[in-house]
Amino acid sequence: MQVLPPGSTGGPSRLFILRPVATTLLMAAILLAGIIGYRFLPVAALPEVDYPTIQVVTLYPGASPDVMTSAVTAPLERQFGQMSGLKQMSSQSSGGASVVTLQFQLTLPLDVAEQEVQAAINAATNLLPSDLPNPPIYSKVNPADPPIMTLAVTSNSMPMTQVEDMVETRVAQKISQVSGVGLVTLAGGQRPAVRVKLNAQAVAALGLTSETVRTAITGANVNSAKGSLDGPERAVTLSANDQMQSADEYRRLIIAYQNGAPVRLGDVATVEQGAENSWLGAWANQAPAIVMNVQRQPGANIIATADSIRQMLPQLTESLPKSVKVTVLSDRTTNIRASVRDTQFELMLAIALVVMIIYLFLRNIPATIIPGVAVPLSLIGTFAVMVFLDFSINNLTLMALTIATGFVVDDAIVVIENISRYIEKGEKPLAAALKGAGEIGFTIISLTFSLIAVLIPLLFMGDIVGRLFREFAVTLAVAILISAVVSLTLTPMMCARMLSQQSLRKQNRFSRACERMFDRVIASYGRGLAKVLNHPWLTLSVAFATLLLSVMLWIVIPKGFFPVQDNGIIQGTLQAPQSSSYASMAQRQRQVAERILQDPAVQSLTTFVGVDGANPTLNSARLQINLKPLDARDDRVQQVISRLQTAVATIPGVELYLQPTQDLTIDTQVSRTQYQFTLQATTLDALSHWVPKLQNALQSLPQLSEVSSDWQDRGLAAWVNVDRDSASRLGISMADVDNALYNAFGQRLISTIYTQANQYRVVLEHNTASMPGLAALETIRLTSRDGGTVPLSAIARIEQRFAPLSINHLDQFPVTTFSFNVPESYSLGDAVQAILDTEKTLALPADITTQFQGSTLAFQAALGSTVWLIVAAVVAMYIVLGVLYESFIHPITILSTLPTAGVGALLALIIAGSELDIIAIIGIILLIGIVKKNAIMMIDFALAAEREQGMSPRDAIFQACLLRFRPILMTTLAALLGALPLMLSTGVGTELRRPLGIAMVGGLLVSQVLTLFTTPVIYLLFDRLSLYVKSRFPRHKEEA
């Protein structure tokens, strides 16, 4: 057994150095656990940060926005408003549709929210209209969250009604059952129905009314219990031909007798098989289609969900006729997988670059292998903990591991460098490992816990941003902690077995050249440091100027929230004049689709026209533009959007709003543009007064572009002003008037056809093809008290007015949402400040309130907490360092290096044209942890030299700087090269990764140069300060 010199205890590493087999098996267990954990980790774009969101949709065909608001939306809102945990409630009431979106607190489980919503709907049921075709339907999805998959079902030979029927019963239901699917919507509105189009003149000629026809149809088609006969020996179930199944049966239905002769429905109406709603349509690449949008449940694994759907599709399509084609138009997981693959490649590249820089400095293969093992072991071991914490493989956790590459190698480098120094002095490898590891153990612990302390404030960030970066911070902290364990166990053990004087002294021509170069650099640094120490006040002036510059740069740098990603999918809204009909919108979307599909970057296009809840009004259309993969097109998404808007701008009567879909969706409604700002009042009249003023003011701001609002109060309305006295004299009630109008113009669902597989509706309406517009009202006839018929014009006057197309509420009060984008020459911070200044200029009254929504609101919250977040990181690190060093002074010396990192990061972001968004801010916070490592390594050795060798503070810090120059340079370059692949990334998701890389590379470059000189000077300054305090207060003998 090798005899160890006195003092070679090895500290916490001793047991692991002396027991190599146990150490090896322990590390193998960590490696195996990480590999197994990796296989169980789900893949996602970002960590799960969705608010629990539930959407409640109620359809009431024919109802005006005002009726939908008062009769449907308001009763529901009153019940929903009593739910605990509700964060925000928004609603949109339009013609025939009410949509209430409920966003709950992040801490409320979605299942609990679902139970509360169901109870509220049940409580409101008695307050809703009795003739609602269907009760309110809720779904656990965020309507603003883009679908994870879009499929188009087309056929060249079959009617779309048959196609939808098959899709609904054979395909959509099966997809809905897939784990993780929150909602499958069918856009296209071609659900089969029997349509009864009354000939108003024929009905009037026979002395009948539409109400007579409706009553006859509803009475002829029933499906109710009829009982059974229970005899002494046999039981018999009663059935009857009370159901009519086809248009032919309805056509033969007798609705009245005229002079003893039967009047059949076919005599006064056109009865045909058609669509339930003829004012809905969807197109895929200009071909009529049924478009299936699949949305995930909040919290669901998007990759696993999409994979399950794709595995199911071949079996589902086999059940359809050959003429029916199912095409996957978009799959968000394609870009998610590509982004994760690119980040994984950057992670491997970072590992390779770090190992390369280690070899460049050590120029020794055994010495390079040791950290080459420590780095992947630390990263792979992290996967085991990630599984335990229910994390996922996503862009942020992979970015954390990529950055961790530069962090985790630092510990191994510090240990190897210190042990190698003793071996080169002639000590045996085992003794050198014990002595070097024991000497450096406290430094490793200081580095680790001070770095983790920087991440602690990230764990306590509130709301959506805190949820977003929790996985990032914990993953990085776990990797750093495992690295410290590996560096104090495996690394010294391998040094004791793999390093020797011969291996370290063995040099080739390249090694000798590198050694001479490093010696010259160290000598130059020594001369420069001596001059700096002789002129401390000049150096302190530079340090103070750096602090001031960092503050100035922080003030002037453009600020943003989250990078705009290129996911290859563009959401669009097509807006037309408020009086536009369905037919005119269908024609306009064809013109727009033709222009869009001509663009070389566009792969496919789906468009939708009509009111279905998701699309609020007839004068708007939804578009989804799917771009070719990034490597198959020349331009990124913003350039494509600009080109498409230019192409469509020449089409008269339309406005096209486009925005790229994002992985991070905070909004609760589909917006025309990226950012939203709301104006809320207690009454609609107050809104109508202030909306135009604020919109005009916002449109004049250069910091905003594409400003629009959802306020639409110029829709055409026919006001039926009934003379109640005349109507009462004739025995006609207002209910009779409403029913007659509803029967004629509401696409009224008057009866249900039940089959074994589905239910279909009977739709009643007037055939208005020959009498369009207000002239159709002249055909309405009502039954008087004596049984005769009276024209509507006899008791009512028709007035044409303007009316709102939709009525929006936020927390039960009327609201208007302004949508806007930010031009490239401005930042989101500029736009937010400009809006706030405009609001002050307008001097809005007290009953008018404004609020940013969605990502803009989150930006405000994040911006307000950023400074406090950085302060909290610094304070946390000070506390940890103070505890470790048992000193109030030395932590300040270490933290004095931080402004240099801020200056470098902010300058790099400005030069690169990047905003200071939350990704870049995280980079700056990480820099706080990295940069202070330089000071820790210097101060640790200086204190040891003063304590053990009796050196003066100046000699001690000078020697420490020269001895630690090489490991400082090595660790800084390792961290820099770990971030370099992120800065230079060009693939899918690069918008997310580049700000972090830019901030870290810039901060490391500047801080490396400055801290090597400022830290020794500040160390000596505080040493003098400490001596001064001791001389003035001699009773306090404790060391500061």
Swiss-Prot record:
Keywords: Cell inner membrane, Cell membrane, Membrane, Transmembrane, Transmembrane helix, Transport
Main localization category: membrane
Organism superkingdom: Bacteria
Cell compartments where the protein resides: Cell inner membrane
Membrane topology: Multi-pass membrane protein
SUPFAM superfamilies: Multidrug efflux transporter AcrB pore domain, PN1, PN2, PC1 and PC2 subdomains, Multidrug efflux transporter AcrB TolC docking domain, DN and DC subdomains, Multidrug efflux transporter AcrB transmembrane domain
A Pfam family it matches: ACR_tran
Transmembrane segment boundaries: 15-37, 345-362, 367-389, 396-418, 438-460, 472-494, 535-557, 867-889, 909-931, 968-990, 1000-1022
GO cellular component, one term: plasma membrane
An MF annotation (GO) of this entry: xenobiotic transmembrane transporter activity
Sequence similarity: Belongs to the resistance-nodulation-cell division (RND) (TC 2.A.6) family. MdtB subfamily.
PANTHER family: MULTIDRUG RESISTANCE PROTEIN MDTB (PTHR32063:SF21), PTHR32063
Subunit structure: Part of a tripartite efflux system composed of MdtA, MdtB and MdtC. MdtB forms a heteromultimer with MdtC.
The name this protein goes by in its record: Multidrug resistance protein MdtB
